[in-house]
Amino acid sequence: MSRSNSRAKSSAKPAMSAADSVDVPVVGMREPCPCGSGRRYKACHGKSASTVFVGPARPFEGMASECDIVAMREVVPAASAPLTLTGANAGRVVTLVTVLPMAWPALVRADGEIMLALQTNVGSGDASRDLADALVSALDAEPGEPVPLGRVTAESPRLQDLVDVDTPLDITVHADFEFWVDGAEEITDDVRASLDRAGSFAHPTVKLASVPSAYWTQMGEKEHLRWVMPQDEETLLNALARLHAAEQDTLGEGTRFVVMFRAQGVVCPVWDLPLGTGAEAIEEPAQAFGTRLAEALLDESPLTDAQRRARAGLTTRQVTLR
């Protein structure tokens, strides 16, 4: 056999099956693919569904509460906030929540209120468009029904296209997930089981009042402060390096700057706190740190040797949340 024939045969594409040509619903990556192939969705149609397009680095950029939305999606277990819709759907009651039963993207309650979830099992790679897609579907869904995630493309609307982006969110942090069923006379066994499972992960969390987008939490025998910041990553790293080199990056005695989460295009520094500190006691130190950080962000002078070493150390503490 000649090389040219070998190449031709190896590059030939198999004929498209009937399953390839149908519109396959989006399901969890580990679930059986709805096309009937017998494979998991991740290894079948989920492959193309997850690589339809590359989303923006900061999907929630331009929203007044970008950092809080990222916090609700990545580090806050149970929280909710009313959304203000614009255009033809202005006035419709929509609540943004961290997560819904069985990780549904959205749910229309019996009274018509839409609950829109940030934490789901599937996604296109653009969290803003995923939310917008679920919201559009929910606007036409019947009350009492969960809403699945549809096909999202680069032409799909963003959440910013459907809601008021200039009004900061009024976020309520919950101790559990009972807000899922507030006012509901009856709930299914599946929802109750999901509520109980989720409740076991609802670590005590408090949103600080003294600084924006900062959340105290206790996880077992540890307390942390997680603070989502809007600054450009490189600029923020330089400022934090200046503070670290000057030993000004802590929140008081016994506290320690430990890691930086990277998520949805922004950075979330994390501090360890002594057990028993509590949220109230960290309000003033966090505010003081915010003042020091603001000053460091204004400093555009070249980093010193000590600051460059500090910056190198900080980069090793970065963890990307996906």
Which residue ranges define each predicted feature?
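Acidic/negatively charged segments and metal-coordination signatures
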Residues: 1-88
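Membrane-interacting alpha-helical segments
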Residues: 2-14, 22-26, 225-239, 289, ...
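Short Lys/Arg-enriched alpha/beta "domain-start" segment
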Residues: 52-109, 167-192
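Generic recognition of long tandem-repeat/solenoid scaffolds
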Residues: 95-97, 114-118, 225-227, 269-271
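Internal, hydrophobic cores of structured domains that mediate oligomerization or house catalytic pockets
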Residues: 110-223
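Conserved short hydrophobic interaction patches
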Residues: 138, 142, 243-247, 289-296
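A contiguous, surface-oriented mixed alpha/beta subdomain in the mid-to-C-terminal portion of proteins
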Residues: 176-282
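Alpha-helical oligomerization segments
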Residues: 254-255, 260-322
